[in-house]
Amino acid sequence: MNNNSQPVFSSRAVLMNFLVLVLCSQFAFAVLAMKGALLPQMLELWNISKTQFGMLMSIYGIVHNIFYVALAWVQDRFSARVLIPVNMVMGGVTTFFLGQTTDFATLCFLFVMLSLWCEGAFWPAVLSAVRKTTADSNQGKIFGLLEGGRGCVELLQNSLTVALYVYLGYSILGLQLAFMVNALVMVILGVVAWFMLPSQTLLKTDNDARQANQEVLAGMKLTLRLPEVWLAGAVGFCVYFVYTAMPYFVTYLDEMYVLPALAISIFGIASTSGGRIAVAFPSGFIAGRLFGGAVGGLGGGFALTLVLGLAMVGLAWIEAASWLAMVCLMGIAFAIFFMRALYFAPYGEMGLPQRFSGSVIAIASFIVYLPSSFAYLLWALILDGNPGAEGYLQMFFAISVLSIVGLFLARTLRRRMSSGTAHRVAQQVIQLDAALGLQGEEKKLSDLIDQANNKNKREFSP
């Protein structure tokens, strides 16, 4: 069978496992989801400025970047059942308390804990499990489905939050209730994940702890020497840097056009959740058909953000009509979510074995999400330090510059991968196995899921 004809999900059990990952991956980021549509209200709830919010996001980013690197090796050494459920439960507890305080020092502490539980080992484990769910040829599709599915959940989250906010007379009590509901769901999902996710790893030395550690470290040495791994991370870095400006699209409309709070919230939901649903779901299929794969799709996305970013520079300068600004901002948001759905797909497309994908994705997460440790604060300082249109003009110009850099890196990565990266990786893996005395076929996560599902059926059948 041709690799391209393989289904995205090999069985119903694999699909159900993926749906659990989608739910966990979005509810774990409930607080971050709210900022896209309700940042002004969140600032009111916590009684903080945009700069203080930027500090909170920078703290969050610094902490999770440290843990991405420190815990990279555990991604291949331990199973998803070990890495995901407990973090979901503890993240739920932290989310509950975030809706109960206005003390900035307490908020700083809670953001540290939220980053520990909902990022650290958790997020790379989710990404790694998603990458292992399907064949290398389906990586753009599976990550597009992940991002689109998360968008559906985010739409539900933000719609509920806005509904509570409006129903309770535009009171921050609605936000507090939303924090409580999301916290409860996170705890429940943590319990469900414990029973659903597979308990085995994909290592060939899974039953020997010492040899398993050697295999993981050898795999990390092999994969992290590949220039393509770092290039793909740099492309994702540019995507995420641009993404961090999105919360300030809402404040731009609020400050420049003084639109009603409800109208701005609706725009925020449409541009974030709507963008993820409308664009992310088909992104892998679009990238494969129109751009020759995920890397080509990333280049196309940067070309669009470059054009629209420059357009927003002009619109901010002349203070154009609000509807025109909203159309351009919506276009940038859609391009960002198109790229976000693709920026981890190259790690599967370049032929990295599933058993070594976790640690690579953890290091990639460090690179990709590095802007979260400084970019939110940087944008806030630019906007607070340059009130009015001047600050936003600088922000949109910076988005254009980042798009140029990202486009260049994506084109470079595509050229290298076209020169035979997958073949070179396969040869190096054969040499690694020979050096360690490892034998046997490569394990697949989908096979482990099906085996566990069949075992459960036998145990519970009459």
Language-model-detected regions and their locations in the chain:
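Glycine-rich segments within core transmembrane alpha-helices of 12-TM secondary carriers
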Residues: 140-165, 365-376
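Extracytoplasmic gate region of multi-pass secondary transporters
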Residues: 35-39, 154-161, 226-280, 340, ...
